Swiss-Prot record:
UniProt cross-references to PROSITE patterns, sorted A to Z: DEAD_ATP_HELICASE, HELICASE_ATP_BIND_1, HELICASE_CTER
Entry note about domains: The Q motif is unique to and characteristic of the DEAD box family of RNA helicases and controls ATP binding and hydrolysis.
Protein's name in the database: Probable ATP-dependent RNA helicase Dbp73D
Species: Drosophila melanogaster (Fruit fly)
Motif (Q motif): 160-168
Biased composition range(s): Basic and acidic residues: 9-18, 54-79, 652-675
Function recorded in the entry: ATP-binding RNA helicase involved in the biogenesis of 60S ribosomal subunits.
Gene expressing this chain: Dbp73D
Length: 687
């Protein structure tokens, strides 16, 4: 039976067999197990910092602790000790614990001091032009020169906006200080249509108007060609009363034509023909590498408009090329280093770095995006229309000081006070019909409709043209699918009233001033709050009233609410269209959709035909190259080959003559002249 013997731990059982308090031993075993379980639980819940002792001492301590545990008996309420035991003060908080009962305080982002405490520009509803007080007229502003006032009057500007009143005198005063005091770089965050272009154009023109020789002293960089053209026109009008020259660089013109307007060469030296250059990033890189004599060593102002977009890496890393060019041509620094700490360093660095001016309606509050520019003691100007009220302001524990802290305004996207925001809920399949019904219901005659892509703009334009066939409203497309020339023509027709509505992609949503837009429609939900701000910014510009309407589906509501919450904005007023629009316009809508499908098939076939044509042309060219080696020789090629053979034979005959004896060489043998050799060659060819 020894094969079936099972050896078990019987030490405690032996004590029970001996009859010495059998029941008490069972309680002791249970108590030991509970204590060990509680000890293991405490080790898992808290991290204790303990010095590592020597191994021998550790084993002895373990034995002593085990012997002590055997002596202590606590049979009553064994779990209460674990529950009432305090956690040591040197232990860390357990991650993942159940602290839902305690209210967690929201962590505030730590910003640099200049971002956390901006200079607030109080904005609001602008007064109509006829109600401008006499004290606010441009003639009464002592910091504006006479030629500036004359140019502004020609532009039909009677007063300055709040942004201009703050920024223009500050820049002029900063440059009035004597060396070595450098002007601080500035960032301006203001709503669209608030006059940011004149805010930097006026002080630059006034500060450069007394220049002696013509050099590039101001560089204005903008993201798109249309916006660059708009800024170029504004600066050109301001310079009309001065001798300053303005040059526009964009891919809408030939590079050679721009080079002629930019530099000229005289007696081996290059001279600049422009004082102010307005450009796009890509075109700037082209001229930095391709235009000889284009030098920026005298650069005094670097203006970056729409700074949040233009600082992205997608613009060919233009800042790197600009910095490299400046370092190669002069000892001037573009990016700069840390702020000088003494008078000698201030004096040595004075005039070696341009004054940087950044402008945007959605200026980023991320310091990393502005790090590449290395701004010199920057200052932020931010526009606030109304004092925002935080949602948690009325709850207990709310930070009341934060309500008056200027840092709360950083990153807030503001819209003009004259803007009315609305939305309309519809079905996805009825979206084009809803846009048509809204235009007809409210009799909008000047509107923009934005989509998320150029292809969507093309399709929507086709459908709306069919729906508006029987009406006086005319719509047209304005997207990246069109050339720059066609886009400019469409904008001119819209400004002249020949077109009532433009169906646009988001390429037009930034900075471009389209005259007298009454309504902006968002056909598709914008992907980000910045896109929405720039879309609605095409209306309610320069104190005029405007309306922004977003067409939504039930599925879009959640995303749109989240987008607006980022700007502390609400949904606005909901507007409706007739529920019978599908029945009323069923025939036209069906015809439009059928035409769209056929147009889509037609475009697809055209693309396939173009692709096949290109492939066939490439194949023919390849065959021509292969057969070029076996084609028969022409007469000229045969004559050339025969002439080469005669030349070779004449060389051989001359070599044989040189190998004659010395006696023969002493005899006089006149050499053949060049004419005789040519005559022989022609005679041989004739034979």
């Amino acid at each position: 039976m020894e094969l079936f013997t099972v050896n078990r731990y019987t030490e405690d059982l032996k004590e029970q067999k001996d009859g010495a308090q059998g029941t008490n031993n069972e309680d002791e075993i249970l108590q030991k197990l509970l204590k060990k379980a509680a000890k293991r639980k405490r080790k898992h819940e808290a991290i204790e910092v303990v010095e590592t002792p020597i191994l021998e001492k550790e084993t002895s301590d373990v034995k002593e602790s085990e012997s002590k545990e055997e002596q202590v008996e606590e049979p009553e309420k064994p779990l209460e000790v674990v529950q009432e035991e305090d956690v040591p003060s040197n232990e860390f908080q357990v991650l993942g614990g159940d602290d839902s009962a305690a209210k967690k305080k929201k962590v505030q982002m730590q910003l640099p001091n200049w971002l956390a405490h901006p200079t607030i520009i109080e904005g609001g509803s602008l007064q109509p032009e006829e109600e401008v007080p006499a004290s606010e007229a441009i003639d009464q502003l002592d910091y504006l020169e006479k030629y500036t006032c004359q140019a502004l009057k020609q532009m039909k500007i009677k007063r300055l906006f709040p942004v201009q009143k703050q920024v223009i005198p500050w820049i002029l005063e900063a440059h009035a200080k004597p060396p070595p005091f450098r002007p601080r770089d500035i960032c301006v965050s203001a709503p669209t249509g608030s006059g940011k272009t004149l805010a930097f154009a006026i002080p630059i023109v006034q500060l450069l108007s007394q220049r002696v020789d013509c050099k590039v002293r101001a560089l204005v960089v903008l993201p798109v060609a249309e916006l660059a053209l708009q800024v170029y026109r504004v600066i050109s009008e301001l310079c009309s009363k001065t001798e300053l020259e303005v040059c526009l660089l964009s891919k809408q013109h030939k590079l050679e034509d721009e080079q002629e307007k930019l530099v000229e060469q005289y007696k081996g030296k290059y001279y600049s023909k422009a004082d102010i250059v307005v450009t796009t990033p890509g075109r700037l890189v082209d001229h930095l590498h391709a235009t000889k004599g284009f030098c920026l060593k005298s650069l005094k102002f670097l203006v970056i408009d729409e700074a949040d977009r233009i600082m992205d890496a997608v613009f060919q890393n233009w800042l790197y090329h600009l910095d490299s060019h400046v370092k190669e041509t002069t000892d001037q620094l573009l990016a700069g280093t840390q702020a000088p700490l003494c008078y000698a360093e201030l004096q040595a660095s004075f005039g070696k770095q341009p004054h940087k001016l950044l402008f945007s309606a959605t200026l980023s509050q991320d310091p990393e995006k502005l790090q590449d520019l290395r701004l010199f003691q920057p200052r932020l100007f931010a526009t606030v229309l109304t004092m925002p009220v935080l949602k948690d302001a009325t709850e207990e524990g709310a930070d009341t000081e934060a309500l008056t802290d200027p840092g709360q305004f950083v990153g807030r996207y503001t819209t003009p006070a004259e803007l009315t925001e609305q939305y309309c809920v519809t079905e996805l399949r009825l979206k084009p019909l809803t846009v048509f019904a809204l235009v007809e219901k409210y009799k909008w005659k000047r509107f923009l409709c934005f989509t998320n892509s150029s292809d969507q703009a093309t399709r929507l334009t086709f459908v709306l043209k069919v729906l508006f066939q029987k009406y006086s409203t005319k719509v047209s497309e304005l997207s990246g699918n069109l050339s720059a020339k066609v886009r400019n023509e469409r904008l001119r027709d819209f400004a002249a009233g020949k077109i009532n509505g433009l169906i646009c992609s988001d390429a037009l949503a930034r900075g471009i001033d389209v005259a007298d837009v009454d309504v902006v429609l968002s056909y598709e939900t914008p992907r980000h709050i910045t896109t929405y701000i720039h879309r609605v910014g095409r209306t309610a510009r320069a104190g005029r009233k405007g309306t922004a309407v977003t067409v939504l589906t039930e599925q879009d509501m959640t995303l749109f609410k989240k987008i607006l919450s980022d700007a502390n904005k609400g949904l606005g007023e909901e507007i409706h269209v007739s529920p019978d629009i599908e029945i009323q316009h069923a025939v036209e809508y069906k015809e439009a959709l059928a035409g769209l499908r056929s147009e889509k098939v037609k475009n697809k076939n055209q693309k396939m035909a173009e692709k096949n044509r290109v492939a066939t042309k490439a194949l023919i060219h390849k065959k021509q190259e292969e057969t070029a080696t076996v084609r028969p020789l022409t007469l000229m090629e045969k004559l050339q080959i025969k002439a080469n053979e005669i030349v070779q034979s004449s060389k051989k005959s001359s070599e044989t003559k040189n190998s004659k004896t010395k006696a023969d060489k002493t005899k006089y043998q006149p050499k053949e002249t060049k004419k005789q050799i040519i005559a022989k060659q022609l005679k041989a060819i004739e034979n």
